[in-house]
Amino acid sequence: MKKLVISALAFASVAAFAEKVAIKFELPPPHSSGTPKEIKSDNLEKDRGPGKLRPPIMVEPEYTKKLTNEDTKVTTSEEAATGENEFVVDGDKTPDATAMLQLPGGVQWVQLDLGAEHEISAVCVWHDQGDERVYKDVIMQISNDPKFKEGVTTIFNNDHDDSSKLGTKGKDKEYRERNDGRPVSAMIDDKPTKGRYVRCYSNGSTSEPINNYIEIEVFGK
């Protein structure tokens, strides 16, 4: 009897996994505007090498809808140095200044208003990938509070020394910017994170103090 129960559970587990599908991120072509710099950081992830993508984010089909579009409201911590807020949701991932939102140096954030609470499965952010630079203090959060004072869920944080002064030392790794951006799962205990607002932080990069954002996409239902 035990064998039958174990077999049934194993079959159910396999069946459940088989029902999941990968979230499809539309990637821009690789782009390099300079020789990648040697970057020394104890918090930098092992280099995957050009062209090698991260493992797919697997979710149930109902959570694969892209929730962001050109009508998504975008706000920022400070007025843009160059570019427009809507650049980060217009679908154009061209890695140059014509599609780039640039915020001043220091800790800055870009916030998306999805219009209503959604069940969020993943967030992906693209910064400037020009010389495979590394952006500092990359943090992604979800909340129903537009001021992010209450009910905040952090799905990614590589600010390992709390230099952003948000009060938490992150455990995620820094990474080189490439054409696949940084996709992050918002599934916690196999359940999506509920929220209306998505906020993405950064604190300049290894190439310059300015914070460059190409695109931010949110998926879920």
Model-derived segments and spans:
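Hydrophobic h-region of N-terminal signal peptides that target proteins for export
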Residues: 9-17
